[in-house]
């Protein structure tokens, strides 16, 4: 599938063998890490043009817009590329839970190490 992603941006991406880059969503204002998902060039293009968090589902092999069915939307304020080009950071306003479980973040349920 051809993507409308700016070729200058596409050239900077370092993709997995499946053509994906990691995408981390962070709450604007607090810096809270909400979730991690995958994007290909088209998902990134859609996110940049619509300001809606748009991702690629590896299991379903299709695009999904965060909150399209749940109402738990993400309005994207910034998109940044990390220094290696293999991860994008989306700074968002998250409506309700970001995790598919309903939790605020995908990192709420399983703490492996915490300060005592």
Curated annotation (Swiss-Prot):
Residues annotated to bind Zn(2+): 83, 99, 106
Gene Ontology BP annotations: L-histidine biosynthetic process
Alphabetical keyword list: Amino-acid biosynthesis, Cytoplasm, Histidine biosynthesis, Hydrolase, Magnesium, Metal-binding, Zinc
Pathway of action: Amino-acid biosynthesis; L-histidine biosynthesis; L-histidine from 5-phospho-alpha-D-ribose 1-diphosphate: step 3/9
Cofactors that this protein relies on: Mg(2+); Zn(2+)
SUPFAM superfamilies: HisI-like
Compartmental location: Cytoplasm
Coiled-coil region list: none
One GO location term (cellular component): cytoplasm
Record-listed Mg(2+) binding positions: 82, 84, 86
Name of one Pfam family that matches: PRA-CH
Entry-linked InterPro entries: PRA-CH, PRib_AMP_CycHydrolase_dom, PRib_AMP_CycHydrolase_sf
Swiss-Prot/TrEMBL catalytic activity: 1-(5-phospho-beta-D-ribosyl)-5'-AMP + H2O = 1-(5-phospho-beta-D-ribosyl)-5-[(5-phospho-beta-D-ribosylamino)methylideneamino]imidazole-4-carboxamide
Cofactor info, note text: Binds 1 Mg(2+) ion per subunit. Binds 1 zinc ion per subunit.
Molecular function terms, GO-annotated: magnesium ion binding; phosphoribosyl-AMP cyclohydrolase activity; zinc ion binding
EC number: 3.5.4.19
UniProt subunit comment: Homodimer.
Function: Catalyzes the hydrolysis of the adenine ring of phosphoribosyl-AMP.
HAMAP family listed in its UniProt record: HisI
Stated family: Belongs to the PRA-CH family.
Protein's name according to its UniProt entry: Phosphoribosyl-AMP cyclohydrolase
UniProt organism field: Saccharopolyspora erythraea (strain ATCC 11635 / DSM 40517 / JCM 4748 / NBRC 13426 / NCIMB 8594 / NRRL 2338)
């Amino acid at each position: 599938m051809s993507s409308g992603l700016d070729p200058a941006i596409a050239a900077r991406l370092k993709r997995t063998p499946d053509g994906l880059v990691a995408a981390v969503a962070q709450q604007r204002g607090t810096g809270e890490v909400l979730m991690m998902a995958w994007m290909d060039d088209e998902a990134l293009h859609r996110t940049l043009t619509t300001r809606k968090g748009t991702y690629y589902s590896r299991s379903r092999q299709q695009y999904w817009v965060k909150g399209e069915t749940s109402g738990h939307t993400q309005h994207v304020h910034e998109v940044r590329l990390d220094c290696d080009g293999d991860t994008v950071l989306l700074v968002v306003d998250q409506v309700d839970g970001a995790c598919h479980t309903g939790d605020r973040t995908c990192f709420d349920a399983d703490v492996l190490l915490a300060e005592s």
